[in-house]
Design a protein with these regions (language model features):
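A contiguous pocket-lining binding segment that forms or flanks enzyme active sites
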Residues: 125
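Extended, charged alpha-helical interaction scaffolds
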Residues: 98-105, 111-113, 117-122
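The feature captures the LRR N-terminal capping module
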Residues: 1-78, 83-86, 96, 109, ...
Length: 179
């Protein structure tokens, strides 16, 4: 009898042989496993999507960012992250990042330096202020989700006339997390 692949592996395989993915979601990880660096050392430049969603990560190392510098999608939702290492700026091919349901109090401004970034999801964090001018200058940005963050009134007033992308925000009175 052949070995059955888990659904996550099957979904990834269906995306095509040219797109390499690594799914480590819901594994109760508190850090990125060092052994993974060794196992993947010859193919890191071919990995375009990593999912570390719904773990217990409190931080990511600079080594993670520099090792997987060819990433196009990074899913980190549902962790305990409060910042990103400066080396996130090495992810020059990154198109989408999901940082929803983490513990960011400050907008991770390093993301504004990524030329290919199209989608940022920061829903359900504790972000008050957003660098609207820097976001407006991002050439590829199409969407940023800031729903369920306690955004200050200034962001709500300044952002709309400056931006040319979709900026999702909760109504002013809906600052609490969703039910």
């Amino acid at each position: 009898m052949g070995r059955r692949r888990r659904p996550r592996e099957r979904d990834c395989a269906a995306q095509g042989a040219r797109r390499h993915c690594r799914h480590l979601a819901e594994c109760k990880l508190v850090s990125f496993p060092i052994g993974i660096y060794k196992v993947l050392r010859n193919v890191t430049d071919q990995i375009h999507l990593i999912t570390l969603a719904n773990n217990e990560l409190k931080s990511l190392t600079s080594k993670f960012m520099t090792t997987f510098c060819q990433l196009q999608e990074l899913h980190l939702e549902g962790n305990f992250l409060h910042s990103l290492p400066n080396e996130v700026s090495t992810l020059q091919h990154l198109k989408a990042i999901d940082l929803s349901r983490n513990q960011f109090h400050d907008f991770p401004e390093q993301l504004t330096t990524l030329p290919a970034l199209e989608t940022i999801n920061l829903e359900e964090n504790e972000i008050v202020d957003v660098p609207v001018e820097k976001l407006a200058a991002m050439p590829a940005l199409r969407s940023i989700n800031l729903r369920f963050n306690p955004l200050n009134a200034e962001v709500r007033v300044i952002a709309p006339p400056l931006i040319k992308f979709d900026m999702l925000m909760s109504p002013e009175d809906a600052r609490a997390s969703p039910p």
